[in-house]
UniProtKB/Swiss-Prot annotation:
The lineage of its organism: Eukaryota, Metazoa, Chordata, Craniata, Vertebrata. SUPFAM superfamilies: Homeodomain-like. This is Aristaless-related homeobox protein. A motif (OAR) lies at residues 421-434. It holds the Pfam family Homeodomain. Residues 215-274 bind DNA.
């Protein structure tokens, strides 16, 4: 009876030593590179000689392991303490025997630790390799054990092999990172070299800058004769070729580079004036000669003699304005008059503003300022003339003596009055002008038709 009870207690101890919690702790220890107490205990027990180990332990080892995995897997840890492998409740004498078994296990564990002299290494790779080397002779000495124990040793060897693969992968990762580290170190060296080179280049640039400052070229002072010749060449072409520039340089005692720079600056100046709208034509105002000299806007538009060959678009616009003026002889000056009277209420300036400056030739940036300046002047002069007029000019034909030009000071005084007048006065004049226009439209058209015929 006592021998049977001892066998049951041994089976229970084997079951408890092979519980899943102990196996999980072994897995954790194998990952961390340490030996688990269960493994050390097994190795200590296996290292004992065969005559010392009891025979019933050899026979019941396989059955105890099977019972442990069948009975304890579905029970929680607290119930495993109370129930045995067959599901039966344990008696009160179990605690005493368990205490004895626990003391014996601790003694065997101390002996095994002293015999094996296990020391935990700080590096994981070294501890894993050491554990693999230390496990190799034990696996060779366990060849005479049971097949299930051999299978367990194979599982342990496979886990160790997996750990070695992990160590190799880590070593490969270290090798893959080491070129990057070398490259980063090399880049750091390059950066330092680059900084030194930057410092050297900065010093060279400063030296070159000092040389350039010493060799600075002063501004070229052109004489009046040189400027006249250059302006004459610029009137011929804005983009002279290299032969023309060299010829000018030879004739004016200059270098070709100075001539080229002067033409560049002159073109920039000309483009700036053209964009501003001040420069209308290189030679003067695009109007016929006698009319351009006495036009009220001639001083504002930098008037001058008209070129002998005007633009065909300007000619067509001028002919259209002349035809419109000839259609109303009472409203336009006679052909023999040589100037535009500012006092004419609906004179040639009105037709110029309506017919000529609506021509497509004047739609551009060059004449933008011309429109903005001419519009208010013509409207103000027309309004002032309508206010000064007492009777409509359509009823009586205009004589040549009545169309004599006023002095040029009248146009400038009218412009000065317009600038000095306030916004309210301008609005009042505009209202009166619109009233006069309505009165002209109310007049019977029969007389006007007879005069036109």
């Amino acid at each position: 009876m006592s021998s049977q009870y001892d066998d049951d207690s041994r089976d229970r101890s084997e079951c408890k030593s092979k519980s899943p919690t102990v196996l999980s702790s072994y897995c954790i220890d194998s990952i961390l590179g340490r030996r688990s107490p269960c493994k050390v205990r097994q190795l200590g027990a296996q290292s004992l000689p065969a005559p010392v180990r009891p025979d019933h332990e050899m026979t019941t080892e396989v059955t105890s392991k099977e019972n442990s995995f069948d009975s304890d897997m579905h029970l929680p840890p607290k119930l495993r303490r109370l129930y045995g492998p067959g599901g039966k409740y344990l008696d009160s004498g179990r605690g005493f025997h368990e205490h004895l078994e626990k003391g014996e296990r601790e003694r065997l564990l101390d002996q095994a630790c002293e015999s094996l002299k296990i020391s935990q290494a700080p590096q994981v790779s070294i501890s894993r390799s050491k554990s693999y080397r230390e496990n190799a002779p034990f696996s060779q000495s366990d060849e005479g054990q049971s097949p299930e124990h051999m299978a367990q040793e194979l599982v342990e060897l496979s886990t160790l092999k997996f750990e070695e693969d992990v160590v190799k992968e880590e070593a490969c990762g270290d090798n893959s990172l080491s070129p990057k580290d070398e490259e980063s170190l090399h880049n750091d060296g390059d950066v330092k070299d680059g900084e030194d080179s930057v410092c050297l280049s900065a010093g060279s640039d400063s030296e070159e800058g000092m040389l350039k400052r010493k060799q600075r070229r002063y501004r070229t002072t052109f004489t009046s004769y040189q400027l006249e010749e250059l302006e004459r060449a610029f009137q011929k072409t804005h983009y002279p070729d290299v032969f023309t520039r060299e010829e000018l340089a030879m004739r004016l005692d200059l270098t070709e580079a100075r001539v080229q720079v002067w033409f560049q600056n002159r073109r920039a100046k000309w483009r700036k004036r053209e964009k501003a709208g001040v420069q209308a034509h290189p030679t003067g105002l695009p109007f016929p000669g006698p009319l351009a000299a006495a036009h009220p806007l001639s001083h504002y538009l930098e008037g001058g003699p008209f070129p002998p060959h005007p633009h065909p678009a300007l000619e067509s616009a001028w002919t259209a304005a002349a035809a419109a003026a000839a259609a109303f002889p009472g409203l336009a000056p006679p052909p023999n008059s040589s100037a535009l009277p500012p006092a004419t209420p609906l004179g040639l300036g009105t037709f110029l503003g309506t017919a000529m400056f609506r021509h497509p030739a004047f739609i551009g940036p060059t004449f933008g300022r011309l429109f903005s300046s001419m519009g208010p002047l013509t409207s103000a002069s027309t309004a002032a003339a309508l206010l000064r007029q007492t009777a409509p000019p359509v009823e009586s034909p205009v004589q040549p003596s009545a169309a004599l030009p006023e002095p040029p000071s009248s146009s400038s005084s009218t412009a000065a009055d317009r600038r000095a007048s306030s916004i309210a006065a301008l609005r009042l004049k505009a209202k009166e002008h619109s009233a006069q226009l309505t009165q002209l439209n109310i007049l019977p058209s029969g007389t006007a038709g007879k005069e036109v015929c």
